[in-house]
């Protein structure tokens, strides 16, 4: 589904991505792990168009999308969440969700004059979708709460909900567990598993919480110094001597 081939990226002479080739299979939950500086975030930034690779390609369903801008990739169904949630703090939870679908008819001044019925129907559909998302993520009771007042874990749930508003092809989750208590992290994990099993969502996540990864992810890709060290089940990864060395050192 998503394929990265022979990818290179350097910053000031330091090679952050070194000849990476990998595939993210459709309807999988793939974890991307490795020590700080391994190149995980740089790889995400290339996939979602935030930065351009020096060479190599990124393909979605065998279509070369290398160099596409983030908004173009959004329209193709590649969505990303961040380690620090990017909510619109002065808008309510529900409004945060409703503003996600692109190219809404009501955004055009002319359409407000000439297509009021179309706008009303579209808004009803988006409202219905937002209500379904909030129900799914157990956020319905916070519909009218300003997003800036949410806890860290609730903001992560809201970000996940924003991706659900457009039925994505792949969701890139950047440390969804960072700063989240275990109860809310379990809720997030439950939602990810349901989206994967019931709606066949594809996820790729950068994550450090091994317990969380063990529950959700197969396969696990290990990165070190800008390269792929291995790709396997988490049980195999935890037993691998090279992985242990990368995380804990030779001694």
Locations of regions flagged by a protein language model:
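Helix-to-loop junction immediately C-terminal to a conserved catalytic motif
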Residues: 48
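Conserved ABC transporter NBD signature motif
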Residues: 56-63, 76
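Conserved ABC ATPase signature
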Residues: 146-150
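Walker B catalytic motif
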Residues: 175-176
């Amino acid at each position: 589904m998503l394929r990265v081939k022979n990818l290179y990226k350097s910053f000031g002479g330091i090679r952050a991505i070194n000849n990476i080739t990998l595939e993210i299979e459709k309807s999988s939950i793939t974890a991307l792990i490795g020590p700080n500086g391994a190149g995980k975030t740089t790889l995400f930034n290339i996939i979602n168009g935030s930065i351009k690779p020096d060479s190599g390609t990124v393909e979605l369903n065998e279509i070369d999308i290398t160099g596409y801008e983030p908004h173009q990739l959004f329209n193709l169904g590649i969505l990303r969440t961040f380690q620090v949630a990017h909510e619109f703090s002065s808008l309510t939870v529900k409004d945060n969700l409703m503003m996600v679908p692109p190219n809404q008819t009501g955004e055009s001044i002319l359409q407000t004059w000439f297509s009021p019925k179309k706008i009303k129907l579209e808004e009803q559909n988006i409202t219905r979708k937002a209500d379904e998302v909030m129900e799914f993520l157990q956020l319905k009771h916070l519909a009218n709460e300003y997003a800036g007042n949410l806890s860290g874990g609730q903001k992560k749930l809201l970000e996940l909900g924003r991706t659900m508003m457009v039925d994505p092809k792949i969701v890139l989750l950047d440390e969804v567990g960072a700063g989240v208590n275990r109860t809310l992290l379990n809720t997030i994990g439950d939602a990810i598993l349901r989206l994967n099993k019931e709606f066949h969502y594809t996820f790729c996540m950068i994550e450090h919480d091994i317990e969380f990864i063990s529950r959700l992810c197969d396969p696990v890709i290990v990165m070190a110094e800008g390269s792929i060290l291995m790709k396997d089940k988490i049980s195999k990864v935890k037993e691998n001597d090279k992985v242990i060395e990368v995380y804990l050192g030779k001694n």
